[in-house]
Amino acid sequence: MASPASITLAEVARHSSPNDLWIVIEGNVYDVAEYREDHPGGDEILRQFAGKDATTEFQDAGHSNDAYVKLKTLLVGSLQSKTLPENQPEESSRIVSIAVSDRGKIPTKRQARNGNDTSKYGQLPSLVLAGGLALLFFTLKQHPWQSIQGYLSQAQVSRVQSSGWVGFLGGFLTATTLNTAAATFVGLTAKKTLLLRHRELEEYPRVKQHYLPLPPKKPGISGENTQQFLTLVDRQCIAPNVYKVRLQGDGLVIGLGQHLKVLAEIDGRKIQRSYTPVSPVGNSPKVDLIIKVYPKGQLGNYLLNLPLQSRVEIRGPFGRYSPSPTWKHIACIAGGTGIAPIYQVMRAWPGEITLLYGNETWEDILLREELEQLVLQSPRRIKVHHVLGQPKSDWKGLRGWITREMIQDLLPEPSSSTGFLVCGPDGMVRAIRGHFEAIDANGEEKANVFVF
């Protein structure tokens, strides 16, 4: 089997268009152009890292074994070692077996240091014991009792004879000396053993631990081969050209931030589209999806005209997202149907959360009643700001597009304890990225931004 080609980072950067899209993950180069439409997280995430190294984001997002299997089919080659980023190891971390007979042949700096420490401490027990015996000999020479038993008898007499205080003091010093010598000998011997054990443990290589997001309390089944047929049981119009579709099935488990693929055969072609459920996460027989129907949208119109009680093919769920445990505040920016994954997080997140939600009109706001209910339940913890592009004349809220000034005025400042979640149309997401780049350039800390 031929070894994979060696590719420079500069060559990878030349493949950064939607139809010619290469990315780097863990030192390998992948061509993901044809995989954009099938990517569970949407093609926007892949285009974000076109021609770049996406190792950190790939590892932070968490992926199933199926994702690694799929990557093998997209492999182009490996990144040249000299072009690897500083934080990217040339080889994956692995545990190395070390034979006992080989230890110590080529000592490292740490081993040499530990060896000197143990030899230094190893001489102390003998010195202390010798000192204790010398002190005991000196004491017995000054007070020549026949034996320890005789000394004890002498000590008892000294309790009632005022002239025997010297004997009592000598006995006390003798006992103290013996106890100190014995305790020191045992303690330092044990310390020497522990230092040797510690040195042996340090001979093994340290394996770098990458941050992994916390899994959902009820993780969903993930994988492209997870296929089910659910029944369309309800369909309601909740905004102009937007419908809430309810599917019913058996044993479907949805985790936080996961989405489903809905598939249908239309005009002899298999069409698929990803949707994030807005129903509660966990094991539920019913799944609610938000579907926006466009005039030329094939799958949306298919679901709009599909008779109730019809079977709908789905795959997944895919993906997984959990906020960082170090975050205390989450700032969300959503547009249109991008509220679906944001709403999932808002409902599950126990900390503070602030939402900037952009729509054209008041009637276009999705899940408006559900969002209002969250605010009523936790008015101090949850805040929602609506931004309308074409509001009525009596609208007193925010107008136009979501701007950098809105982000800076209404959302928390970037910090290690704050996360930013973004989901919406591609144009809005690109604009928000530009705003954060400007904010990062002028701020002390960079924003922790995650795009669904």
UniProtKB/Swiss-Prot annotation:
Its cofactor is FAD; FMN. The chain crosses the membrane at residues 120-140, 166-186. Disruption phenotype: Fully eliminates the production of asperlin. InterPro entries: CBR-like (IPR001834), Cbr1-like_FAD-bd_dom (IPR008333), Cyt_B5-like_heme/steroid-bd (IPR001199), Cyt_B5-like_heme/steroid_sf (IPR036400), FAD-bd_FR_type (IPR017927), FNR_nucleotide-bd (IPR039261), OxRdtase_FAD/NAD-bd (IPR001433), Riboflavin_synthase-like_b-brl (IPR017938). FMN binds at residues 33-38, 80-83, 116-125. The keyword Metal-binding applies. Its main location: membrane. One of its GO terms (molecular function) is metal ion binding. Keywords: FAD, Flavoprotein, FMN, Heme, Iron, Membrane, Metal-binding, NADP, Oxidoreductase, Transmembrane, Transmembrane helix. It is an enzyme of class 1 (oxidoreductase). Binds 1 FAD per subunit. Binds 1 FMN per subunit. FAD binds at residues 302-305. Pathway: Polyketide biosynthesis. Its EC number is 1.6.2.-. It is found in: Membrane. It holds the Pfam family FAD_binding_6. CDD domains: cyt_b5_reduct_like. NADH-cytochrome b5 reductase-like protein; part of the gene cluster that mediates the biosynthesis of asperlin, a polyketide showing anti-inflammatory, antitumor and antibiotic activities. The first step of the asperlin biosynthesis is the production of the intermediate 2,4,6-octatrienoic acid by the highly redusing polyketide synthase alnA with cleavage of the PKS product by the esterase alnB. 2,4,6-octatrienoic acid is further converted to asperlin via several steps involving the remaining enzymes from the cluster. Belongs to the flavoprotein pyridine nucleotide cytochrome reductase family. This is NADH-cytochrome b5 reductase-like protein alnC. It comes from Emericella nidulans (strain FGSC A4 / ATCC 38163 / CBS 112.46 / NRRL 194 / M139).
